Amino acid sequence: MSNTGTTGRIPLWLVGTVVGTLAIGLLAVFFYGSYVGLGSSL
C-alpha cells in the first residue's frame, strides 16, 4: 500500500471509525451474550 494516489479511496479516518465501531459492537454483543448465558456455547 502506498500513500500516493489516495484520490477515490476511502479516507483512513472513516475506515478506522467503521472498524472501531464494528469491533466495539462485536465485543458488546459477545460480552452481553456471555453474561446472559448464550455466549457460553461459544
Curated annotation (Swiss-Prot):
Coiled coil: none annotated. PSII is composed of 1 copy each of membrane proteins PsbA, PsbB, PsbC, PsbD, PsbE, PsbF, PsbH, PsbI, PsbJ, PsbK, PsbL, PsbM, PsbT, PsbX, PsbY, PsbZ, Psb30/Ycf12, at least 3 peripheral proteins of the oxygen-evolving complex and a large number of cofactors. It forms dimeric complexes. Gene3D superfamilies: 6.10.250.2070. The chain crosses the membrane at residues 10-30. This is Photosystem II reaction center protein J. Disulfide bonds: none annotated. PANTHER family: PHOTOSYSTEM II REACTION CENTER PROTEIN J. InterPro entries: PSII_PsbJ, PSII_PsbJ_sf. It comes from Chlamydomonas reinhardtii.
